[in-house]
């Protein structure tokens, strides 16, 4: 069913909305599911309108950046665009040195760094206020009995650190970054961090999430087993996913 999402908020504010993902539309049923999330365009690997190149196993990040730039330039309205990249996803036992998973991973992220820098430099030349928010979901999954994680003594009891990710925020115009959170926060707050940064409109739900971030910045028993259940967050999640969406 259709649900209020971050994309639908931007759509209500007059933005065109797009989701770009350089992989199969059927994976995780993304095409069917994301059609309910308020995106005007869903662009999967078969829908790209720029030349496609691969790096490692998957479509390279440079191709995704090129597609994003093309959409920005072709869209007359303000654009909210969400993309999930694939280049640096497992498996890492590829190429000339399949046994050197760590080396392959470092090579791939170096490649992304170079292309991301070029992407940002291109956005500097775009005559539209533009903000980029980039975040990962977890560190790489490395196999083997003597992987770096084994050497660090990581196991199922202490692997939560793999999901503690830094983020990058960049804009081609002056923004006040003084209010950016300096402490750790759960990833589901990230859209509201961005909304606060650009001074987006706030309805009661957005304000409630921003208030919750002040009092409960991290909500995860994997991060801290002593964190109790938060009834407000649980009810809001239920309402948005399974309930009658009375919180809109």
What are the residue ranges of the model-derived segments?
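Solvent-exposed soluble domains appended to multi-pass membrane proteins
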Residues: 1-248
